[in-house]
Amino acid sequence: MKKFFALLLALVMSLSLVACGGGDDATTDDTTDDATNEETGGETTNDYKISVVLKTLSSEYWGYVKAGCDAAAAELGVEVSVVGPGAESDIEGQVAQIEQQIGAGCDAIICAPNDAGAAANALQAALDHGIPVLSVDTDVGIEGQTTFVGTSNVDAAYEGGKWAIGQAGDGAKAVIIYGQEGDNTSNMRREGYQKACDEAGVKVLATLSGQNTTDGATKTMEDMLSAHPGEIDIVLCHNDDTAIGAMNACKNAGVSDVIIVGFDGNASAVDLILAGDLIKATVAQQPYEMGYQAVEAAVEVLNGGTVESVINAPVEVVTAENGQAYLDNLASMQG
């Protein structure tokens, strides 16, 4: 593969020299591009192609990330291609998409990996050929990547867990429904929830995977309710789809005295919170902003600039008290 790219690069360079009439003209073209970028205050005038490979496009949360990417592309005048497999569990499908995007040609690639190790192996081809690699939401952690745009999942889950424990009071018992096995984000959120419980002396009755889906979480919650009847006070969930699955299981079992906490800040979850349903809070990331900032960072680097190695995205615990304000702000960002 490396030999193929080397031959292709040599061919392109030789054709460019013929078209430009020699090395002096080629140098002039490079200078003109730099000058144009300076005249526009850092905004690109090049036809940059930026590929974005998300965990999936089949969820509300990742739709927000895509919307942020698209908004940045429109504002900065670049072409962005956003893809993702049908489910977050489809690791091989995502790897294939990464390889397809690199093979099709891109100036930078942004990835939210379903499996960091598998994604890193595929993204190495981009780094080997000088293509900037950026992570969004979940850190690929590959040596040489440009930046990670995202949330400290440990700290964010810790805040969500602390809020739930404060609402439940002394003697509460909890369960944790985490996401995909082996996923870095899932591991970090589970760690944050566990930390909050440990510090408060809250017993964690069970920690099981909900497979990042509503149906998977429903089945997991049913198993937890069967194993610990009448004992569960708090359900700490990997994301809002998981929280909705847990809520469905509780309703089916006639359980109403439970505090369910989601994660992501999806509008569908906030609507349930405001309606007084079993989901009482969601740890809201800023997915739209993360998508926007990732594309913005890619353009900055392509224009010859530099960015921080980590671009932190803020979080807040959304409850019935601040839910409507959160929804209003979310709507305003999406136009």
Per-region residue spans from a language model:
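A residue-level marker of the well-folded mature domains of exported/periplasmic proteins
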Residues: 17-335
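Sec-dependent N-terminal signal peptides of Gram-positive bacterial secreted proteins and lipoproteins
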Residues: 2-23
